[in-house]
Amino acid sequence: IVSPPVCGNELLEVGEECDCGTPENCQNECCDAATCKLKSGSQCGHGDCCEQCKFSKSGTECRESMSECDPAEHCTGQSSECPADVFHKNGQPCLDNYGYCYNGNCPIMYHQCYALWGADVYEAEDSCFESNTKGNYYGYCRKENGIKIPCAPEDVKCGRLYCKDNSPGQNNPCKMFYSNEDEHKGMVLPGTKCGDGKVCSNGHCVDVATAY
């Protein structure tokens, strides 16, 4: 059963152009609260691309860029709504070829080390990642049926993340994070560059052309 639209309930329903509540409570200068229609001369009553009852000018930014792989969206000048959030395609090089776009982000190991440990912590030397071939409680590439699968030699940069700590008072060339509560935390993130033209996918270092 579909209830008929009710003007004044602050829900935009079928047949309504706006709904700002009852005439006594309406705070929207663009909307006629008695009819739930836009007032004469108004193009819109709400939305990220609605300013003073008019569509925002074409090109007005309505959603900021979150990363190099997630460009800003801009109003069209024909609608009160911001266009859908779109990303650059997965696999597009980013951050001066240090990474590849993945779902709107540019995952690189340096940023992941920074998120875990803060400043002065960087991606560790390749030798540190060899521990991921052990298949022990922390050094592995993925889990299958609860069993930790060791990394193949070519996949070691798609398992546990290793960082080099250069912060004051620290000298840890192979710093890693492990938690029993969250075993995924401290693993290299999917989509991270693991070699030239290669990214991490399901614990494997694969060609970026075939990953997506």
UniProtKB/Swiss-Prot annotation:
Molecular-function annotations in GO: toxin activity
Segments forming a coiled coil: none
Keyword Disulfide bond in annotation: yes
UniProt keyword Disulfide bond present: yes
GO cellular component terms listed in the entry, alphabetical order: extracellular region; plasma membrane
Entry comment describing in which tissues the protein is expressed: Expressed by the venom gland.
Ranges of residues in domain Disintegrin: 4-90
Protein family per UniProt: Belongs to the venom metalloproteinase (M12B) family. P-III subfamily. P-IIIb sub-subfamily.
Function summary: Inhibits human platelet aggregation stimulated by collagen with an IC(50) of 420 nM.
Note in the entry: Negative results: does not inhibit platelet aggregation stimulated by ADP. The disintegrin domain belongs to the long disintegrin subfamily.
Record-given protein name: Disintegrin-like halysetin
Organism per entry: Gloydius halys (Chinese water mocassin)
